[in-house]
């Protein structure tokens, strides 16, 4: 077949073949391509946003103001040594208190204490119970404390005992001393708190020994117990575990410490808590609604 003949016949053949091919809407393909490109763009934007959020969350975690304090509590060799040392001091002081009929730890204790059975009052969180796993959650996910997230943590019944706590409490009970626990936890957390104490096999004879915050202040609880017991020791990690008026300016809080200087390490046994407490909120006036940046700015101003 000659090339000229083929050239004349090709258009006709192409027309025949085209009759059997599906119709192609070029405009529709262009729109689909645009949609695909748009979808990929959106997907990439979402992916970038997620990765950015993850990076931001990780960066915020590594710069969270509680990171070093919580790390020290959980991983340092010094903290368990300090905790056991503090409980050992409490045991020695308990022996002295039992031998001295005039010994009392509560400022709320009035009148003659002769004949009253002995008791001690211990704060729970970060004195008896170790809640640092909750602080880890704050650092990694939450950003700051909230009553709801803390309640969720409490209901898991996963708090461990502070090193030395069980040995000291068993020692107190063996010497005929009643153990009372008071806490800033709410009444709605009574059942899970009770389960946690019993799970750790800590002395807990009945519900009257667990005193929770939304019924009375800690000072009122001390006054109530002082009517029926001679209070030998107070144990805690916050000033309000020992004395009223601690929710105050930092300078006032230090004045309270100085006023009762003879009681520290004797009737009053304090535990270190570098993670939270009234000390942390005092620089910004306990105004928890302030933006975090403003809270930090006011804390920075406190430094000398």
Can you name each region flagged by the protein language model?
Residues 54-122, 285-293, 297-304:
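Non-catalytic pre-domain segments flanking phosphatase-related domains
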């Amino acid at each position: 077949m000659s090339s000229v003949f083929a050239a004349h016949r090709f258009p006709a053949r192409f027309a025949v073949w085209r009759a059997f091919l599906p119709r192609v809407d070029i405009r529709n393909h262009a729109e689909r391509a645009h949609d695909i490109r748009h979808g990929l763009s959106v997907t990439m934007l979402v992916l970038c946003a997620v990765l950015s959020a993850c990076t931001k969350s990780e960066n915020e975690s590594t710069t969270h103001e509680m990171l070093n304090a919580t790390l020290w509590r959980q991983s340092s060799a010094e903290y368990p040594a300090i905790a056991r040392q503090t409980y050992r001091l409490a045991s020695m002081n308990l022996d002295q208190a039992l031998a001295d009929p005039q010994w009392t730890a509560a400022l709320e204790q009035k009148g003659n204490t002769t004949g009253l059975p002995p008791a001690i009052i211990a704060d729970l969180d970060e004195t008896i119970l170790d809640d640092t796993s909750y602080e880890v959650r704050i650092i990694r996910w939450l950003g700051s404390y909230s009553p709801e997230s803390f309640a969720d943590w409490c209901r898991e019944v996963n708090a461990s005992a502070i090193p030395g706590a069980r040995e000291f409490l068993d020692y107190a009970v063996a010497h005929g001393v009643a153990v009372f626990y008071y806490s800033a936890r709410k009444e709605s957390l009574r059942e899970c708190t009770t389960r946690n104490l019993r799970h750790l096999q800590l002395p807990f004879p009945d519900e009257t020994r667990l005193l929770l915050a939304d019924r009375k202040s800690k000072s009122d609880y001390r006054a109530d117990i002082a009517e029926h017991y001679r209070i030998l020791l107070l144990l805690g990690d916050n000033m309000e575990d020992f004395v009223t008026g601690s929710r105050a300016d930092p300078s006032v809080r230090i004045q309270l410490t100085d006023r009762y200087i003879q009681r520290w390490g004797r009737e009053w046994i304090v535990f270190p808590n570098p993670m939270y407490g009234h000390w942390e909120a005092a620089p910004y006036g306990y105004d928890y609604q302030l933006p975090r940046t403003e809270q930090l700015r006011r804390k920075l101003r406190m430094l000398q």
